[in-house]
């Protein structure tokens, strides 16, 4: 049960929790604004999303604005990060960069630090490298509400006019916030109730966001970790690996005679496990195990 306690901690479950039925918009769907980079999703879109968010949570409320941004390992994630930062700071927001990190970590940082107004994750999850997306997370660590999304879409379509620029000392700043990601790693480690010493754990990081975080957690808990697909190059995210190609992990676990294995998708908000025989432990069983554990404790 402890493996699931670590991998499906409150933050991962919280982010995936459905609060309401979301109606598909022109740009934003059930999991953000997603499309092929520089086709359906462009840097102009990202810049305008940043401009609106910075104004909406800042000047429009006559207050300062703080936004945290994370990204996955796609080549295009960097240009979208720069575009978002430009838009946010131009509207007066201060931006805190977690750099390459997981979607649940962004939700965790936003929810647990009182002064963040929202979080943004740049990722297209399990999609191919040429796609990308912008996920918006509110200050409760949940998906952005439909009313805010509707206002952003109206701004993208030019229906709500321009938002004012910041000037002078009102222009926002950019902060390296790797410490936030490290705090999330510490949080995951704290969920364990005992050492994993002697356990042999396989990890398929999908050449994505989990490539550094997952190993750090299991190493700290004393497990012997065996990692595959943890050398991202900007183009190999989700390519014949990760949670959408579970056979790769199944073969790896059986070949290395491991106790258990976990496969993530590109932004590590999805995880599938296999047991020592390579049998798949899917999301339904995850929920059952977590529910049973919570009931018993």
Model features per residue range: what roles?
Residues 1-23:
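Short, Lys/Arg-enriched N-terminal segments with co-localized hydrophobic residues
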Residues 36-40, 93-96, 276-280:
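A short glycine/serine-rich beta->alpha loop
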Residues 66-131, 216-274:
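N-terminal small/polar loop signature for handling phosphorylated ligands or for N-terminal nucleophile
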Residues 45-52, 105, 183-187, 245-248, ...:
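Well-ordered alpha-helical segments embedded in enzymatic catalytic cores
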Residues 52-60, 251, 292-296:
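A short, N-terminal amphipathic alpha-helix
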Residues 36, 132-254:
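Gly/Ser/Thr-enriched, mixed-charge loops and adjacent short helices
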Residues 15-86, 90-91, 174-199:
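An N-terminal, well-structured beta->alpha segment
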